[in-house]
Amino acid sequence: MATLVELPDSVLLEIFSYLPVRDRIRISRVCHRWKRLVDDRWLWRHVDLTLYTMRPKVMWHLLRRYMASRLHSLRMGGYLFSGSQAPQLSPALLRALGQKCPNLKRLCLHVADLSMVPITSLPSTLRTLELHSCEISMAWLHKQQDPTVLPLLECIVLDRVPAFRDEHLQGLTRFRALRSLVLGGTYRVTETGLDAGLQELSYLQRLEVLGCTLSADSTLLAISRHLRDVRKIRLTVRGLSAPGLAVLEGMPALESLCLQGPLVTPEMPSPTEILSSCLTMPKLRVLELQGLGWEGQEAEKILCKGLPHCMVIVRACPKESMDWWM
């Protein structure tokens, strides 16, 4: 069996990539070879800092010493639930990310208070922005904001962002490159607001609406009216009926449809009704049913047999993470 000393650099780099950031830095003290490997650009393309309570001083050090132009994606947490005296993400730090990390494409922020951080301070190179349990101000996504902000943004994930409301949704229209939108637990968005917002976001190709107060029927109606080119839909089945699902019939570009439980409504379409609607979707290739309790049941057999051209996935909902920031 080969020892660590005998392993080639490429294998050691692969091993080091699975280590948390703190451990990567510690092992750089083992020997000159490991120090050189830890400094390799490849190892710092994707960085996850959500495991730590990261003080701004430490973050600045990481930014200057290790990340810089190497960084492609970054996950980091804030101090939203740590009290008013806790340090917060600053506009200066986010601006520095944009200046020192010109290759940064994806930024995921968790439990961060962004109410005093202008959206203009985010790196302009971002293609994906994820906000998980974050606070934002009313001005953050206001329609009258500078239209040149985040010109390359293609995907935005808003997961349990309590301040997000109809006005914010309509403000997303200034991101002309936006193609993917995920709304998770954004309970302030209304049916009227969703319809008005999607009317101006007709170029979206992927939409997920999960755990919101909106009924599935009203969501699908808005999609059928305004998102004729949508390719992927994922939504919670709360308030879904057979007539509501039928509004998707004939959707010309839809390739993937996911209906996510738990099953809580007697109006839920039967497997036969779901099959009937799916057969009218010419490009449908993936049908996923999550958390409906149909695994191994007759419903699964009906759908698999009736949709031979589709990948039919029937499974339980994945277990929710025990990590409070996820």
Swiss-Prot record:
Give the record's GO CC terms: cytosol; ubiquitin ligase complex
Family matches, as Gene3D superfamilies? Ribonuclease Inhibitor
Q: Which PROSITE patterns match?
A: FBOX (PS50181)
Question: Pathway, according to UniProt?
Answer: Protein modification; protein ubiquitination
On whether Repeat is a keyword of this UniProt record, the answer is yes
Q: What is the effect of changing residue 63 to H?
A: Found in a renal cell carcinoma case; somatic mutation
Q: Which InterPro entries match?
A: F-box-like_dom_sf, F-box_dom, LRR_dom_sf
Alphabetized, the UniProt keywords read: Leucine-rich repeat, Repeat, Ubl conjugation pathway
Q: Which domain of life is it from?
A: Eukaryota
Where does the record place its LRR repeats? 51-78, 86-111, 113-133, 161-185, 186-211, 212-236, 237-261, 266-291
Q: Where is the F-box domain?
A: 1-47
What range does the record give for the signal peptide? none
Q: Which GO terms describe its biological process?
A: protein ubiquitination; ubiquitin-dependent protein catabolic process
Q: Give the protein's function.
A: Substrate-recognition component of the SCF (SKP1-CUL1-F-box protein)-type E3 ubiquitin ligase complex. Mediates the polyubiquitination and proteasomal degradation of CAMK1 leading to disruption of cyclin D1/CDK4 complex assembly which results in G1 cell cycle arrest in lung epithelia.
What is the protein's quaternary organization? Answer: Interacts with SKP1 and CUL1.
| Protein's UniProt name | F-box/LRR-repeat protein 12
